[in-house]
């Protein structure tokens, strides 16, 4: 099968997670999910960048994508997109937790982790939902997510949506 098919299927499978991950940063000054609590190391659990409002917006936008995809892929995709969006954001929170443990401040660059934490959460959701992926689709989305992360963050920085270009 030509590589373009793997790329197309990867984008379709991961579109709810991509949209969810891209929409959360638009929420400013929400209620932190960690309620500003510290871990045993004295550092914040997640930080101010992970909010209930951002989570709600992300899951709502990701699920909305699933409603649209359901017209083409079947009603099951509404469920898949909800779980995928939720677990993508959970993956993003795990990434934030790891960054805090490493002593990295909010917005600090962590190449690889910044681009792939939400993809791993979304992949878990697809597996739970019994959506079969092959290695080519997974590798395609890893490359796509990495490139999109760099491009969209640079655009968001130039538009003053983000304070750093990564």
UniProtKB/Swiss-Prot annotation:
Reactions performed catalytically: 2,3-bis-O-(geranylgeranyl)-sn-glycerol 1-phosphate + CTP + H(+) = CDP-2,3-bis-O-(geranylgeranyl)-sn-glycerol + diphosphate
EC numbers on record: 2.7.7.67
InterPro entries in alphabetical order: CarS, CarS_archaea
GO cellular component: plasma membrane
Cofactor: Mg(2+)
Disulfide bonds: none
UniProt topology in membrane: Multi-pass membrane protein
Main location, first listed in the record: membrane
Gene Ontology molecular functions: CDP-2,3-bis-(O-geranylgeranyl)-sn-glycerol synthase activity
GO biological process terms held by the UniProt record: glycerophospholipid biosynthetic process
Compartment(s) of residence: Cell membrane
Keywords tagged on the record: Cell membrane, Lipid biosynthesis, Lipid metabolism, Magnesium, Membrane, Phospholipid biosynthesis, Phospholipid metabolism, Transferase, Transmembrane, Transmembrane helix
Pathway per the UniProt entry: Membrane lipid metabolism; glycerophospholipid metabolism
Family that this chain belongs to: Belongs to the CDP-archaeol synthase family.
Record's function text: Catalyzes the formation of CDP-2,3-bis-(O-geranylgeranyl)-sn-glycerol (CDP-archaeol) from 2,3-bis-(O-geranylgeranyl)-sn-glycerol 1-phosphate (DGGGP) and CTP. This reaction is the third ether-bond-formation step in the biosynthesis of archaeal membrane lipids.
Protein name as catalogued: CDP-archaeol synthase
Primary gene name: carS
């Amino acid at each position: 099968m030509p590589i373009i098919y793997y790329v197309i299927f990867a984008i379709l499978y991961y579109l709810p997670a991509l949209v969810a991950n891209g929409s959360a940063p638009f929420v400013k000054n929400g209620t932190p999910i960690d309620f500003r609590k510290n871990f045993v190391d004295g550092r914040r659990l997640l930080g101010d960048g992970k909010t209930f409002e951002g989570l709600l917006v992300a899951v709502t936008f990701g699920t909305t994508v699933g409603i649209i995809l359901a017209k083409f892929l079947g009603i099951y995709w509404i469920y898949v997109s909800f779980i995928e969006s939720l677990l993508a954001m959970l993956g993003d929170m795990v990434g934030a937790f790891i960054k805090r443990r490493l002593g990295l401040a909010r917005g600090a660059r962590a190449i690889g982790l910044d681009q792939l934490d939400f993809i791993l959460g979304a992949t878990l959701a697809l597996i739970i939902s019994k959506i079969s992926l092959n290695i080519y689709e997974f590798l395609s989305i890893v490359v796509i997510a990495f490139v999109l992360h760099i491009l969209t963050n640079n655009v968001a920085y130039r538009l003053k949506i983000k304070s750093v270009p990564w």
